[in-house]
Regions:
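Residues within the helices of the helix-turn-helix
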Residues: 11, 22, 52
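A short, Lys/Arg-rich alpha-helix, primarily the initiator
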Residues: 1-19
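The alpha-helix within a helix-turn-helix
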Residues: 14, 25, 55
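Short, basic-rich loop-to-helix N-cap that marks the start of a DNA-contacting helix
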Residues: 42-53
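Short alpha-helical DNA-recognition segment
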Residues: 19-37
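Short, charged recognition helix plus adjacent turn
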Residues: 37, 66-73
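Residue-level detection of the helix-turn-helix DNA-binding "recognition helix"
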Residues: 15, 29, 40, 70
Length: 73
């Protein structure tokens, strides 16, 4: 059974807020590889603390960062 996926919209948010990966690393207290993996969508298990730090740094809601994509019927 197909359940759908979660799309990470970090690149679009960063562009909208005019924020570089380096600045996000600094503001969210994350290392480069973490930010890069979130930007590339290479995350299989989300860390609530990391998501909270990203949302705080970007001044956004969790729903702005993540989107549920239902399975194709």
């Amino acid at each position: 059974m197909e359940y759908g996926t979660i799309e990470i919209k970090l690149n679009a948010l960063m562009k909208q807020k005019d924020m570089s990966k380096r600045k996000l690393c600094r503001m969210a207290e994350m290392n480069w590889s973490q930010v890069d993996n979130y930007c590339k969508g290479n995350i299989t298990r989300f860390d609530a603390d990391v998501l909270a730090r990203i949302c705080t740094a970007l001044e956004c809601e969790l729903g702005d960062l993540l989107e549920f994509v239902p399975p194709e019927q």
